[in-house]
Amino acid sequence: MSLQFLKAGTADAVSLMCISKKAFDSDVEVGASSVGGPPGYATLSFHTKMARMNCLYKLVDDYKIVGGALLFLKDNELNVGRIFVDPEYFRKGYGIFMMQQIEAMFPQVKTFSLDTPIWNVRTNAFYQKLGYVEVRRDGDFVYYEKRRDTE
């Protein structure tokens, strides 16, 4: 296993779109009422746009893309818009590796934020395991943050 977490280009958009679709559609196994996902999760135009905006990242294992992320940096805060791993690679440490790399890539960031659906038992447990703390919730989502002192 030779893992790398890298910025994705527009040439990676098709692969990342396919993985995103498989990953989010698999949420029916952990509480989703039907297949589906966040806005643009299964469209090439969305992933291409995110790559052009330098917000799309890829997780590569031995030259094969196995996952991705959307990251939005603003000042000292990073919003993890989403991460996704090909279901073939679930429960093999890829998500943990990706989140560790995200935190390491942005040493200036003091607050990492993200949200996940209330019904998704898999992702809620995952983010809590990584030290993310619930800061609020609404009818649909749980909002998490992880703060660090950069001084």
Predicted regions and their residues:
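Conserved active-site alpha-helix within GNAT-family acetyltransferase domains
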Residues: I96-F97, A104, I118-R137
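Terminal substrate-recognition subdomain of acyl/acetyltransferases
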Residues: D140-E151
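Conserved GNAT-fold acetyl-CoA-binding loop/helix
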Residues: C18-F46
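Conserved acetyl-CoA pyrophosphate-binding loop and the N-cap/start of the following alpha-helix
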Residues: Y89, G93-Q101
